[in-house]
Structure formats: structure tokens, C-alpha cells
């Protein structure tokens, strides 16, 4: 008798949970390319400590502050494939180009190329697909090489 009681209670609980779950809608907002006025493809995403969202987009770096979208281009107007945020810098990787964006005193994002400081390494056909941090260094990964940035110097590994 006690077993039947627990089985009935369990079945009622499962039915209740299922009914509640079917009415659950996750808090997701879908944005179309016409909403943010940039390319259709977003390749990477990161969030800054200020709450802003950063997207590697087919037309550059997309920034969403919760109210408006802004697009920031990299040299050559290449696709931004990777994004990594560390403190006040937004590191990006693109085709034959990598570096970081940083807010100026006027509050606008300015791009600083790191790949232009590479000595004796051709960036031809290199695309930065991944950015990671390890032991205080930022590493940029392409299909053929890794690049290390310690805050002062860039070098190919």
C-alpha cells in the first residue's frame, strides 16, 4: 500500500514537472543582421567586465552594449575570427592580422595592430582562429604558427 502511494506521488510529480517544463521559454533574443547592420556570420563571442558583448563578425568586431550595436573594422576589412577580452583590451584575430582594441580617453575603440611588429615572419595566408592566455601572455593561434604577446613584444613560436 505504501509503495503504491509513493508510485502515484512520483507519477504526479513527473507530470507536474513536465507541464511546467513545456511552458518554459529561455530568455534568448535573436538578432538579425539588419538589426546590427553587419555581416551575417558571427565567428566568436566574448563578454567584457563592463557587460559589453564582443562578436567576431564577417565585417569586423561587433560591440553590443545592451542598447546599440557598433561595428569596428580591422586593417584590410577582414573577417574577425577570434575574440578574447582581458581587462581593458579586446584581442582579435583575423586574416593576416591580429591585435587589440582599446578604449581611448574619448571613449571610442581604437585598434592596435600587433602583427605589424613581427620580424622575419610573413603573415601571408595566416588566419588567427584562436586566442588564449597562459602565464600572463596572450597567444594567437593560426593553422601554421603560434604568436606570443607579453604586453611589450610579439614573437612567432
How would you name each of these model-derived features?
Residues 1-157:
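Carboxylate-rich, polar loop motifs that coordinate divalent cations or form catalytic acidic clusters
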Amino acid at each position: 500500500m505504501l509503495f503504491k502511494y509513493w508510485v502515484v506521488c512520483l507519477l504526479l510529480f513527473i507530470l507536474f514537472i513536465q507541464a511546467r517544463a513545456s511552458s518554459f521559454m529561455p530568455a534568448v533574443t535573436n538578432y538579425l543582421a539588419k538589426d546590427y547592420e553587419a555581416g551575417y556570420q558571427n565567428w566568436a563571442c566574448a563578454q567584457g567586465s563592463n557587460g559589453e558583448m564582443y562578436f567576431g563578425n564577417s565585417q569586423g568586431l561587433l560591440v553590443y552594449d545592451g542598447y546599440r550595436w557598433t561595428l569596428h573594422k580591422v586593417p584590410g576589412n577582414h573577417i574577425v575570427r577570434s575574440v578574447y577580452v582581458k581587462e581593458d583590451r579586446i584581442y582579435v584575430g583575423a586574416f593576416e592580422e591580429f591585435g587589440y582594441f582599446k578604449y581611448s580617453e574619448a571613449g571610442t575603440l581604437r585598434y592596435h595592430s600587433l602583427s605589424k611588429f613581427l620580424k622575419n615572419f610573413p603573415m601571408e595566408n595566416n588566419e588567427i582562429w584562436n586566442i588564449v592566455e597562459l602565464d600572463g601572455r596572450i597567444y594567437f593561434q593560426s593553422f601554421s604558427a603560434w604568436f606570443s604577446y607579453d604586453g611589450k613584444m610579439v614573437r612567432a613560436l
